[in-house]
Amino acid sequence: MFKTLVTMSLAAGLVAGTFGTAFAEDKAPVKIGWAAWSDAEFVTKLAAKLIEDELGRKVDLVQTDVAPLYQGVARGDLDAMMMAWLPQTHADYFAKVKDKVTTLGTVYDGAKLGWVVPKYIPEDAISSIEDLKKDEVKEKLKGRVEGIDPGAGLTRLSEEAVKDYGLDGYKLQISSEAGMLTTVDRAIRKKDWFVATSWSPHWMFGKYELRYIDDPKGALGEAEHVDVLARKDFEKDDPEVAGFLSRMKLPIGDLEAAMFDAQETSYEKAVDKYIAAHPDEVKAWLGKEDG
């Protein structure tokens, strides 16, 4: 069913005894889906590390696009996903599967979508999406809005924003998160003007001096929450892992800092650092507050 999926077992190649708890041999691996976005990658790999190390369960991580993630959880091909942006960004995807999935909990609050510009662009030149209609601004930006992948909710909302604001002569550049970041990095090095689609939390705000521009029409939505979705019977079939995922919640500031660490080192090192720095938080997720 998932011909295009890339499945990675975190336990592959590791010798016996690496983990403090041996894998439960009588239980199938926990299959968690994720899309190639930096926030999703960190929280998913953090969860997988703890499920394997602390709960003794093998985890298979399945990377694909957003739509197949929702479909996979709804069909039961995946046990869970940890990146449901609601109520607006993923509204269309969620509406199609809401009766076939279970919401386990919210992994973080305060998520935000928007368009960003570098801080070296004067605010009196660009403070709002409305300002992009100025002829001199359009010329500086070359009529481009740097975007991400075509299946992203941010892409859909940004396409609508171009229409809502009457940005004639502008084109949303469909790419990927990596492609957008490459363009941003190159532009900043040359002090070129640009506007890019982005979201919080994201490590780019730790690396570059960026600011959101106002969205007076609310085309890109308000603050959102990012939820953990599971297949219908997951809580009954696997109450220990489901309980862990339902309790896992990160402050958005801590998450953004960890994502920046991941870019500076690696996701694996950033995950280990987060676990070491937040022992009480991790114990609460594991249901071990009292020992």
Q: Language-model features: where?
A:
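A ligand-binding cleft/hinge motif common to bilobed small-molecule-binding domains
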Residues: 82-97, 186-211
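Short, well-ordered beta-strand elements
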Residues: 25-39, 57-62, 142-146, 245
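A conserved helix-loop-strand patch within extracytoplasmic ligand-binding domains
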Residues: 99-148
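Ligand-binding cleft/hinge of the Venus flytrap
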Residues: 47-56, 131, 136-171
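An extracytoplasmic/periplasmic, membrane-proximal ligand-sensing/linker region
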Residues: 41, 154-189, 223-225, 240, ...
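A bilobed periplasmic-binding-protein/Venus flytrap-type ligand-binding module shared by bacterial periplasmic
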Residues: 113-123, 224-237
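Short helix-initiation/N-cap motifs at beta->coil->alpha
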Residues: 37-38, 58-72, 172-183
